[in-house]
Amino acid sequence: LRLYCCRRGHGIISALSGDGGLTFQQEAGVRIAPDGQWDQGTAFAPEIVRIAGAGYRMYYAGYSTAGRADILTATSADGLRWEKQSRPVLSPGGGPWDAAKCSEMCLLRLPDRELGAPRYRMVYEACDGTAPGHRGVWRVASATSCV
């Protein structure tokens, strides 16, 4: 069993459990370093989805320097080495409720459409940025997509 979490100042790390999740031992290395255009402030809140026959997809939140938070994604064949995708999958600005930040997501699988690709609903925290410092009112929002 592998657990992914954020370690402040380092990015997303992982730990393994050999006892069904009662205890974990941190693995060496960083899975997602906060070193890209969209996550240079921090990378946090990982959510992992297994892709049939293709490894894993991680969704995670990233802060850029301007107090903006986007939802980002990376893929991996083994769960250890991750390749970041070049653009966010969800960015602020979709509506007045998420004008400044999109973060802390949770992915839910929806019933498949007949002969269609899997469908997912992403529930996430959204901030309107109406207060000083890109702060403001936080709400729960959602979006749907096929993976």
Where would I find each of the regions flagged by the language model?
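Carbohydrate-active catalytic/glycan-binding domains of CAZyme proteins
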Residues: L1-V147
